[in-house]
Amino acid sequence: MEKSKDISFYRRSEPSKGINFLSDISKQLLLDCLQSNTANPFFELIDNYKTQADLSFCGLSNLVITLNALKVDPKTKWKGIWRWYSEENIMCNNIEKVKDYGMTLSEFGALLNCNGVKNKIYRPVNENFALNTVIDMNNINKTLYDDIKENKYSCVTCDEHFNSMIPFNIVSKEFMSACALASAKYNTFFMMCNLGRKGLNQTGDGHFTPIAAYNAKKDIGLLLESARFKYDSRWYSIEDIYNSLIEKDSFTNKPRGFLLIEKKEKEGKKLKWMKR
């Protein structure tokens, strides 16, 4: 036991899938995206990107990155006279719970809502899923709804906030459209993935990562990596990313998925989401 305490690692070897963000090929891929206007989230995200502050903080740190990239005012002091988001001052967040259990996709969406950012959840389904299937409001996310009723997410108590976390089912072709939409729309519209690392030939379980650019010619997306002590940011095929979203979250027993996130320019303005 004494010996095991001395074991340490400096990063993992590169996974067999994907293209390293720092490679020459990556530079050309990003240049193509910039020229075709499909890397709009890139600069806002990379300007605020950082290594996650704890091993289980991929969700929380990416939440902080997202809020700061969207230029949301936290309305609370960070240090000195400055207001800024950090892992310690996210409204309604239980940081000790996140250290122990991490964060689910629904919790990520709930915390975005608590901090004034509109979002919608999409989960992958079998290709044969009927797109007109009626979603049962009584059964979806029951665990999260119970938490809300018990006031565990203190300000997420109204139906409006909960309804925005009801997931829309999506198939792979629609996922490709979502990637194109999120990368080309504008720099206040992000796509955050909650994927299973195994689908990308990486070690570990669930992970949060935004798609910062989408190369339509090669049909690949750039995933930014908050666990920089472990892996570099990489480009992956849209097929591989989608398949990694199908993996079930061991905590919720539901497929993982992604969020489309948009900053509201004006209070009450209706947001246009991906059409069904």
Locate predicted features:
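Long, acidic, intrinsically disordered low-complexity segments
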Residues: 1-23
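Generic cytosolic/nucleocytoplasmic N-terminal low-complexity/intrinsically disordered segments
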Residues: 2-4, 150-151, 253
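Cysteine-nucleophile protease catalytic domains, especially the papain-like/related folds used
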Residues: 15-146, 155-166, 250-265, 270-276
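A short linear-motif detector with a strong N-terminal bias
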Residues: 36-38, 44-46, 98-99, 168-173, ...
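Generic hydrophobic secondary-structure signal
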Residues: 58-70, 108, 179, 185, ...
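A generic "cationic amphipathic patch" detector
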Residues: 71, 79, 206, 223-224, ...
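Active-site-adjacent substructure of cysteine-protease-like catalytic cores
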Residues: 127-225
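Noncatalytic regulatory segments and standalone regulatory/sensor domains
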Residues: 215-276
